[in-house]
Amino acid sequence: MVKIPNATHDAVEWIRDCIHQYTLSGENSLPLESGHEPAWEAPLVGFSRGDDPLYQRFKEDIGPFFWTPSEIFAATFPDAKAAADELTVISWILPQTEQTRLDNSKEKTLPAERWAFSRKYGEDFNVKLRDQVVKVLRE
């Protein structure tokens, strides 16, 4: 069982570290002819409050199908109660590797092969990363 630290700062760093460590795993891989290489560079990880007014603004701008943190929490955990200010949203960005950016910058009509691979295999990794974050938070 993974022990989540009590202090907010420690918990933030613990979650960031869990995400970062997973990106160092073999799951973060592009199967290229030249061999496997990481699909993504080190992730950028951020947090926001569940009651951030931007979520309501997104809903107004995007449409009623956009779920606020409170709405998705209630749909996912119908028996649990949590106020919006008790929720934290975890977000991450998986930056393209320098080599992918370089290869793609040389292309004029179609994406570079490495970029196309990162689109497919990188998104597969992103799904696994989401599952991993859920797993460690539930432990």
Language model segments and positions:
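Non-catalytic, usually N-terminal nucleic-acid engagement modules in DNA/RNA processing proteins
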Residues: 2-122
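Signature of the catalytic double-stranded beta-helix
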Residues: 119-139
